[in-house]
């Protein structure tokens, strides 16, 4: 099983798809990596030679921030926005949408589950 950036790639998938299991590598970046390393994109991970695996591993670590480093960078960027008190930082802290979306309705993903507020009870007649 090939390991790239601390992630075990699934053995039965094509290398092009398997690379997307690494945080920070999507399909277009995986295709770019394969083109630059000269590995056949139709190769399955189980059929990958040690030489090819080493080529992929070194190319990814030298050219991209992936996995833990990328997660740390993202969280530090958000922390910086919060610390300097920007509007975006306040929205992150409040758990609301950051990029100008409406919040009167929708925004459920960012705000979490609905909290039902009991309405006024009708007086019995």
UniProtKB/Swiss-Prot annotation:
Keywords: Ribonucleoprotein, Ribosomal protein, RNA-binding, rRNA-binding, tRNA-binding. It comes from the Bacteria. GO terms for biological process: translation. Residues 96-125 are annotated as: Disordered. Residues 101-125 have a biased composition (Basic residues). One of its GO terms (molecular function) is rRNA binding. One of its GO terms (cellular component) is small ribosomal subunit. Gene3D superfamilies: 1.10.8.50, 30s ribosomal protein s13, domain 2. Transmembrane segments: none annotated. Belongs to the universal ribosomal protein uS13 family. Part of the 30S ribosomal subunit. Forms a loose heterodimer with protein S19. Forms two bridges to the 50S subunit in the 70S ribosome. Located at the top of the head of the 30S subunit, it contacts several helices of the 16S rRNA. In the 70S ribosome it contacts the 23S rRNA (bridge B1a) and protein L5 of the 50S subunit (bridge B1b), connecting the 2 subunits; these bridges are implicated in subunit movement. Contacts the tRNAs in the A and P-sites. This is Small ribosomal subunit protein uS13.
